[in-house]
Amino acid sequence: MSEYIKFSCERVAGEITSFGGLAELNAYRRKLLDLRLIGADPTGVGFGNLSVRDGATKNFYITGSATGGIQELTLTHCAKVVAWDFERNRVRYEGSVMPSSESLTHAAIYQSDATAGAVVHCHCSRLWAAILNEAPTTSNAVEYGTPEMAYEMTQLFTRTNVQIRKIVVMAGHEGGILTFGKDLEEAFAILMRQREKISPE
């Protein structure tokens, strides 16, 4: 499913040999899968992704492209993003799978907020519609996975209270919502608090 990736990728190393946060990432992925906030559509196209910052570095681990529907991830399903260039629309990574198509968007959050340690990108049409333009929202003219989205994300940190609310609605990517926090626990909790505001499906 690499056709959904809109940036150029440079693989700089083979398989990831270790990722201490994999068990926790899988635990929160299972919760999101159970809630159908990530997964795969009827045609098998995956949606949703998670990432975790690599300690105090700028690098981050992210679920690989087209892995949304996989129940349990291994190291072969994750990539480690080690460099990016918004202007050149380029990502450098380690791993045996290409990083998620939203890697530049995740990178923009980590670059803009030094306290961010994890990012969740999910899909929920009802929540998306409920908080569109009420929560920090990207322009509906900006497509997902593009340098424009990365720049838009960085701008949200200067013109909105996104650093406090830690949630973003992607207006040009129907259903797309991002939350972030110091870790996956916080990013997931923020999403759940917002979800509780809408009536049960």
Across the structure, where does each feature detected by a protein language model lie?
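Glycine-rich flexible loops
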Residues: M1-E201
